[in-house]
Regions:
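A conserved beta-strand-loop-helix scaffold within acyl/acetyltransferase catalytic domains
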Residues: 1-44, 49-60, 100, 105-233
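Short secondary-structure capping/junction motifs at helix and strand boundaries
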Residues: 83, 93-105
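Active-site phosphate/ATP/adenylate-binding loop shared across adenylate-forming ligases
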Residues: 74
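Active-site/acyl-donor-binding loops of N-acyltransferases
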Residues: 36, 49, 53, 107-132, ...
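Aromatic (often tryptophan-rich) hydrophobic motifs at membrane interfaces
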Residues: 37-48, 58, 69, 77-92, ...
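Residues forming anionic-ligand binding surfaces in small-molecule and nucleic-acid pockets
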Residues: 62-70, 118
Length: 330
């Protein structure tokens, strides 16, 4: 694992989601089988491809690089090393009898495969100076951040997951999305240590928002987060991302990765309002047993009734049922 991670960190195309720790996370938190492939020559790793198998009667059977992650796909020192791993992955997909093999990348890895460009990512360099970062936010959004600052909000690094889980689960329930388990977030903290951090926002001692972020090289990735019902009135979510930007800059971070969003959604518009430019993501598919590309996303009309029902669930019930569903939504 140390050699794998050293290779990932040394490659410019390496991401947090290529790290070997995801093997432990996916197996321990969800019980999914992992297949982390690598190519070695003369004792040196030349290519890696993290893969995990997600199998469910309701949502199908897939082999993905990497489930629950926005990025993945192969990393290689040369195209022929990459192609060798892709050949191994397609053979594995056939042996496992999956519906499809999926690669999630920031550039095309298998040009002959069908590709979906449903998602974009938002990444932007930040300054070491907080005032410069504030000035870089477009005027209208900057005014919203200032309202949060004036609302008496307070940010702090959280050592536990309870306050985060309450804010996060409230938010995703309201969106109609099944929540992940507490265990998943505990495992993330245990596996990634200081590279996985929670920032919680309070107002008069009450939690209003919280975000779990990943740190990789000089990058910060706010990945899971949300706010309570009180968050909207005091602009807690806007303040939260601003506070994270300040905190990350203090840690020497120079790239703020706002993560992926689906084109045409509210999250997409929110990130554009911060002055971030969308960059395309390429999700490529090799069909094995499947006859069509998968369409497992909230914009699919097939899931509209389920989403509407989920939004009306009591919070405690969504927290109990959610993990049984979300483990297959990788």
């Amino acid at each position: 694992r140390a050699r794998w991670d050293a290779f990932v960190r040394a490659r410019p195309e390496g991401t947090f989601f290529h790290l070997s720790g995801w093997q432990q996370v996916l197996e321990q938190a969800f019980g999914h089988r992992t297949h982390f492939l690598y190519l070695e020559q003369q004792g040196q790793i030349e290519a890696v491809l993290p893969l995990a198998e997600v199998k469910s009667r309701l949502f199908g059977h897939s082999l993905v690089s990497t489930p629950f992650c926005v990025y993945g796909g192969p990393i290689a020192t040369a195209p022929h090393h990459r192609d060798a791993l892709l050949d191994a992955a397609t053979r594995l997909a056939t042996e496992l009898g999956v519906d499809h093999l999926e690669l999630r990348s920031m550039s095309r890895q298998a040009p002959d495969w069908p590709c979906k460009e449903l998602y974009v990512t938002f990444r932007k360099e930040i300054s070491a100076d907080d005032e410069q970062n504030l000035k870089a936010i477009p005027r209208k959004q900057r005014a919203v951040v200032r309202k949060g600052i004036d609302a008496g909000l307070h940010s702090e690094i959280d050592t536990g997951i309870d306050r985060f889980f309450h804010a996060y689960s409230s938010s995703v329930r309201n969106l109609g999305t099944p929540v992940f388990s507490r265990k998943y977030f505990r495992v993330l903290r245990e596996v990634f240590g200081d590279e996985c951090e929670i920032l919680t926002i309070t107002r008069q001692g009450e939690t209003v928002a919280s975000v779990m972020s990943f740190y990789f090289r000089d990058q910060v990735l706010p990945y899971y987060g949300g706010g309570t019902e009180a968050a909207r009135a005091c602009k807690a979510n806007d303040f939260m991302y601003w506070a994270l930007m300040c905190h990350a800059a203090g840690r020497g971070i120079r790239l703020f990765d706002y993560g992926r969003s689906k084109i045409g959604t509210g999250a997409y518009d929110f990130k554009k309002n911060w002055g971030f430019t969308p960059e395309p993501l390429y999700y490529e598919y090799h069909l094995v047993k499947g006859q069509a590309l998968p369409d497992l996303n909230p914009l699919n009309p097939k899931y509209r009734l389920l989403i509407n029902t989920w939004q009306r669930l009591p919070l405690w019930l969504s927290q109990w049922i959610g993990p049984w569903v979300s483990r297959y939504l990788g």
